Swiss-Prot record:
Positions of transmembrane segments: 101-121, 161-181, 197-217, 256-276, 312-332, 381-401
Species assigned in the record: Xenopus tropicalis (Western clawed frog)
Name of this chain's protein: Solute carrier family 25 member 46
Region span, Disordered: 1-91
Signal peptide: none
InterPro entries, per database record: Mitochondrial_sb/sol_carrier, Mt_carrier_dom_sf, SLC25A46
Basic and acidic residues bias (residue ranges): 1-13
Chief location bin: mitochondrion
Chain intervals with Low complexity compositional bias: 82-91
Biological role: May play a role in mitochondrial dynamics by controlling mitochondrial membrane fission.
Database matches in Gene3D superfamilies: Mitochondrial carrier domain (1.50.40.10)
One GO cellular component, as annotated: mitochondrial outer membrane
GO biological process, one term: mitochondrial fission
Subcellular location as annotated: Mitochondrion outer membrane
């Protein structure tokens, strides 16, 4: 085994020694203090052999020696322990990175790409007050998806996806800038107080106020029919949102509601969705951690398995939080989308037939009038039009989570 020290080293008492000239043996360390790792406590200093501290990836050890893992067999030779710990830690590190990247990519794909056709159908059903079929069943949603793709192609199910990313980017950017200038907390720590909660929710509310015109433009792109309109440009959402604020651009109908009327229901829906999803997420994580006791790190393969298992509770918590928030706020979302789409001269696909178009000519005066009109003309189930799309969306999400877990469990078993 060849030493991995450099040929030249400007350390203290090095160049003048015979070892520094290359014609002597390796001298023992003469420091009078025990070496410690950054993560070690006072009673664990005897487990380390390096000085200065053993930084992961460094080679400042004795020739042929490496830092043993805590809890490893102290009777084993230093070379054997070092080789075993190095191979297991390097393999675990690669698998952890691969697992984190793959699981994050699968979650991102599911939430933003795979779920988008369900979001398109869900919004079209919500704003279609002409519809006689409420599309409450997932089977009817699958049937209408097939009809749309047959007449317009697969592109019709992913319309407006670019604008949704733009709205998310505007939301994140606005939140960061507002937090920087107003010093409102973006996140809550464990020692929160009512003042911090109020400031945090105020920040979220201000973000939803800024996003409101762009959300309207994005909603139009996701529900308008591909039969009538051409594909919008990538930045059309930005231009239409700014034009909505400045009263410029395409002329709208007189029934168009002003942004001040749309701001309150938009902020209300956003704040309630955030509160519900955050509460459900923390509760699910609490019960999962309480149900599965913490495991002490063992050998390399078990450590990798434990590390992989740490990813999925958070994904499950996010899944449950989004599902509960979407289900509980579905009636309010239906009202919100109808108010946003009113007066925009939007023509949508006929969700009853799948091969025709219908115009949106509603005449709601505000939030309260929209609720009363839906209840009077469409009944209580009118607030849940297109609910089958939610069932399809989260069923696909659950399937992807399960497949991802099976794949990475197989990877870990193969590596071990």
């Amino acid at each position: 085994m060849q030493p991995r020290r450099p040929d030249r080293f400007d350390g203290l008492e090095y160049r003048g020694t015979s070892w520094g000239r290359g014609d002597g043996d390796v001298p023992p360390y003469q420091h009078g203090f025990p070496a410690r790792s950054f993560s070690s406590s006072g009673d664990l200093s005897q487990h380390w052999v390096t000085t200065p501290p053993d930084i992961p990836g460094s080679r400042n050890l004795h020739w042929g020696e490496k830092s043993p893992q805590y809890g490893a067999d102290s009777n084993a030779g230093p070379a054997a322990v070092g080789e075993e710990s190095s191979s297991s830690s390097s393999g675990g590190e690669h698998l952890n990175r691969f697992a984190g990247f793959g699981i994050g990519l699968a979650s991102l794909f599911t939430e933003n790409v795979l779920a988008h056709p369900c979001i398109v159908l869900r919004r079209q059903c919500q704003v279609n007050y002409h519809a006689r079929n409420y599309q409450l069943s997932p089977f009817s949603i699958v049937n209408i998806m097939y009809s749309f793709t047959k007449t317009q192609g697969f592109r019709a199910l992913w319309k407006g996806m670019g604008s949704t990313f733009i709205v998310q980017g505007i939301s994140l950017g606005a939140e960061g800038m507002l937090s920087e200038f107003t010093h409102l907390p973006r996140e809550l720590n464990h020692k929160w107080n009512p003042k911090q909660i109020g400031g945090h929710l105020l920040l979220k509310g201000l973000v939803y106020v800024i996003v409101t015109p762009f959300y309207s433009a994005s909603l139009i792109e996701t529900v308008q029919s591909e039969i009538i309109h051409d594909n919008p440009g990538i930045l059309d959402c930005l231009k239409e949102g700014i034009g909505r604020v400045l009263n410029l651009g395409v002329p709208y109908s007189k029934r168009l509601l002003p942004l001040l009327v749309l701001t309150f229901p938009t902020v209300l829906h956003g704040i309630l969705h955030y509160i519900i999803s955050s509460t459900i997420q923390k509760c699910v994580l609490f019960f999962i951690k309480k149900k599965s006791p913490a495991q002490l790190p063992g050998d390399g393969s078990n450590a990798v398995q434990n590390k992989l298992e740490d990813y999925f509770p958070e994904l499950i918590a996010n899944f449950a939080a989004s599902l509960c928030a979407d289900v509980l706020l579905y009636p309010l979302e239906t009202v919100l989308h109808r108010l946003h789409i009113q007066g925009t001269r939007t023509i949508i696909d006929n969700t009853d037939l799948g091969h025709e178009v219908v115009p949106i000519n509603s005449q709601y005066e505000g939030l309260k009038d929209c609720i009363n009109t839906i209840k009077r003309e469409e009944g209580g189930l009118g607030f849940y039009k297109g609910f089958g799309a939610v069932v399809v969306q989260y069923t696909l999400h659950a399937i992807v989570l399960q497949i991802t877990k099976i794949i990475y469990s197989s990877v870990v078993q193969t590596a071990s």
